[in-house]
Amino acid sequence: MAFNTVLELPFGKGRRYMSKAPGVVNQVLGGWKLVWVAYMQTDQYFSPTFSDSDPSNTNTFGGLPDRVCNGNLPSGQRTLERWFDTSCFVSPPTGRFGNSGVNVLDGPGLHVHNATLLKRFQINEKLHFDYMALVGNVFNHPNFLAPSNDISVPGGAGVISSTHGLYSGERAGPRMVEMRVRLEF
C-alpha cells in the first residue's frame, strides 16, 4: 500500500500565518510544500528451496522441497536468526518433485516513509530557482530482505542477513538526506 500527500504549508502571502509579511520575509518563509510518501507492506512472500541432487530424475538441480507442516512461525517467535521453521521442509524422496507451494512463507514487512520539502524562489519573470530537501526513510526503520530460503544449507536457512541497502524509493536502506538546488531561466 502506498500513500502520497502534498501539503502547502500555511505561511506567507495569502496563507493563514504571516499573510502580511514583508516581501523578503514572504520570499523566504512563504510558499513551501511538504510531500509525504509512505510505503507499507505486511509481508514479502517467498518460497523454500533445496539444492540437493536431482530427486525427480529430470536433469534438474534443486527445486521446491516437501512441506510437512506450515513453516511460518508466529510473529512473536520470529528472529533474524530463525524467521521460519526449517524443520517443516525436507528434500523430496527419489522419483518425484517436492509438494511445497510457491510463496508459502511470509517474509518481513516493509515500512518506509519519505518526505520532501520544496520551494520555488521567483527572482524575476524569467528566472527562478527551486530548492528541495529530500529525506528517505524518515524514521530510519530497518527494512529486511527475505531470509535465506535454501534448506540444504546447514544453519543458513531462515536467517536474515541483509537489509535493503541503498535508497530507491519504496526500498529504502538507512535514512538518507539529500538537498538539491536548480536554477531555471
What are the functions of these language-model segments?
Residues 1-185:
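Short, solvent-exposed micro-motifs at the edges of structured domains
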